[in-house]
């Protein structure tokens, strides 16, 4: 069993003038045994610092870090039974694949040579690199080197894997292959895993749950679909998803949201969810924007196509409201067969069941999009 718990964990550094720099502030997380949790956020948000505190490479300023019932504060990195995989493969260039994978076991355990050899060979079989055992790192591709780095962690048979952007040095094709490989390995091994990334695709496709950080604070923890469809606040709404959610600042006048270039009438049911908020931000995902059709019951507006980005299977269409400021643009995704071009006049519709509304002052979500009343979806996004 390996349940990892962060209880109000804080990390504070001291600058040259003696002032405090709060890198991580009161983060609380319960990571279940065997769970794959992804820590995601922009550069400098505190995700790698959080991972390094878990590993024992950074001290915890305040709060408590536990592995099951064992408090890890003050426990050295080598005594935590936690293995870490870095962005840099950090392989010994003069050692073979076998030597790189066995070195840690030879130096820090009392395991007999036969058992070390067996562990290395079983792990290389699992990773599909058994034919590379006698090669040096300089003779390996980037993907092969990453597999060796993973294998070095796996042979330790740790309670927890920590991975700090391990795929960022690979090209796009290899990253896609390794995402699948990592998910397969983690499922087979059943080891609790915490994975740090800034990559949207990795966050959405790899984790059982996603923890979104910004400016050292935890913004939301949930399944990938939960964070995508039901963001807690403006930051999560704007950060999760590519292209990102369209966000329009405005105000409430009676039952109408008034934005730059468009007025959006709200139903009574939506209005009732807003409390006393008057300053609002309206959000809608690009895939929920309908282009070129006037649909009854949906709010439809005149727009002009600014730029079209063909992506093969779909297009990212950047538009602006005809009656709005030229600087206020938004995005719709359409099929790859869509025939719109820059300069075209068209219409866009924002279905009310697809919009999000956020408090203009706090950024907190007041209304998230409606989802189908499907038992499987509801169960998935509410865990």
UniProtKB/Swiss-Prot annotation:
Its membrane topology is listed as: Peripheral membrane protein
Q: Which residues bind ATP?
A: 41-48
Pfam families in UniProt: ABC_tran, TOBE_2
Q: Name one GO molecular function term.
A: ATP hydrolysis activity
Q: Where in the cell is it found?
A: Cell membrane
Query: Which cellular component terms (GO) are annotated to the entry?
Result: ATP-binding cassette (ABC) transporter complex, substrate-binding subunit-containing
Q: Which Gene3D superfamilies match?
A: 2.40.50.100, Nucleic acid-binding proteins, P-loop containing nucleotide triphosphate hydrolases
> So what EC number does this one have?
7.5.2.13
- Keyword rRNA-binding part of the UniProt annotation: no
Q: Which reaction does it catalyse?
A: D-xylose(out) + ATP + H2O = D-xylose(in) + ADP + phosphate + H(+); L-arabinose(out) + ATP + H2O = L-arabinose(in) + ADP + phosphate + H(+)
Inducers of expression: Transcriptionally up-regulated by both L-arabinose and D-xylose via the pentose-specific regulator XacR.
Which stretches make up the ABC transporter domain?
Answer: 4-240
Asked whether the keyword Membrane is assigned, the reply is yes
Q: Which UniProt keywords apply?
A: ATP-binding, Cell membrane, Membrane, Nucleotide-binding, Plasmid, Sugar transport, Translocase, Transport
| Top-rank lineage group of the source organism | Archaea
InterPro entries recorded:
AAA+_ATPase, ABC_transporter-like_ATP-bd, ABC_transporter-like_CS, ABC_transpr_MalK-like, ABC_transpr_MalK/UgpC-like, Mo/tungstate-bd_C_term_dom, NA-bd_OB-fold, P-loop_NTPase
Q: Which purpose does this protein serve, as stated in its record?
A: Part of the ABC transporter complex XacGHIJK involved in the uptake of xylose and arabinose. Responsible for energy coupling to the transport system.
Subunit structure, interactors included: The complex is composed of two ATP-binding proteins (XacJ and XacK), two transmembrane proteins (XacH and XacI) and a solute-binding protein (XacG).
Family the UniProt entry places it in: Belongs to the ABC transporter superfamily. Carbohydrate uptake transporter-1 (CUT1) (TC 3.A.1.1) family.
Q: What is this protein called?
A: Xylose/arabinose import ATP-binding protein XacK
Supply the source organism for this entry: Haloferax volcanii (strain ATCC 29605 / DSM 3757 / JCM 8879 / NBRC 14742 / NCIMB 2012 / VKM B-1768 / DS2) (Halobacterium volcanii)
Query: Top-down, what is the taxonomic lineage of the species of origin?
Result: Archaea, Methanobacteriati, Methanobacteriota, Stenosarchaea group, Halobacteria
State which gene encodes it.
xacK
């Amino acid at each position: 069993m390996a349940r990892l718990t962060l209880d109000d964990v804080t990390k504070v550094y001291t600058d040259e003038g003696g002032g405090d720099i709060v890198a991580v502030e009161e983060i609380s997380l319960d990571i279940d045994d065997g769970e794959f949790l992804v820590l995601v956020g922009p550069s400098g948000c505190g995700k790698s610092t959080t991972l390094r505190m878990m590993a024992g490479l950074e001290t915890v300023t305040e709060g408590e870090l536990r592995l099951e019932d064992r408090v890890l504060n003050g426990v050295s990195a080598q005594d935590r039974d936690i293995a870490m995989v870095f962005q840099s493969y950090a392989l010994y260039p003069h050692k073979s694949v076998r030597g790189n994978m066995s070195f840690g076991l030879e130096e820090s355990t009392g395991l007999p040579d036969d058992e070390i050899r067996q562990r290395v060979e079983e792990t290389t079989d699992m990773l599909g690199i058994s034919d590379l055992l006698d090669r040096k790192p300089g003779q390996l591709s980037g993907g092969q080197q990453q597999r060796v780095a993973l294998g070095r962690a796996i042979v330790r048979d740790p309670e927890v894997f920590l991975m700090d952007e391990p795929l960022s040095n690979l090209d796009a094709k290899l990253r896609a292959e390794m995402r699948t490989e990592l998910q397969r390995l983690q499922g087979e091994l059943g080891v609790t895993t915490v994975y740090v990334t800034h990559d949207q695709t990795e966050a959405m496709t790899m984790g059982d749950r996603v923890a979104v950080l910004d400016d050292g604070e935890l913004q939301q923890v949930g399944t990938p679909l939960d964070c995508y469809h039901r963001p807690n606040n403006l930051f999560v709404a704007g950060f999760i998803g590519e292209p990102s959610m369209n966000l329009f600042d405005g105000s409430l006048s009676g039952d109408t949201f008034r934005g730059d270039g468009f007025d959006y009438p709200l139903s009574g049911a939506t209005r009732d969810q807003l409390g006393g908020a008057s300053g609002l931000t309206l959000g809608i995902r690009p895939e929920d924007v309908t282009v070129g059709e006037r649909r009854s019951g949906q709010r439809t507006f005149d727009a002009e196509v600014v730029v079209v980005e063909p992506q093969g299977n779909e297009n990212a269409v950047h538009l602006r409201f005809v009656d709005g400021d030229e600087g206020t643009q938004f995005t719709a995704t359409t099929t790859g067969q869509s025939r719109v071009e820059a300069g075209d006049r068209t219409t866009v519709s924002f279905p009310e069941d697809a919009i999000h509304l956020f408090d203009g002052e706090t950024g907190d979500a007041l209304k998230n999009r409606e989802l189908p009343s499907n038992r499987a979806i509801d169960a998935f996004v509410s865990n």
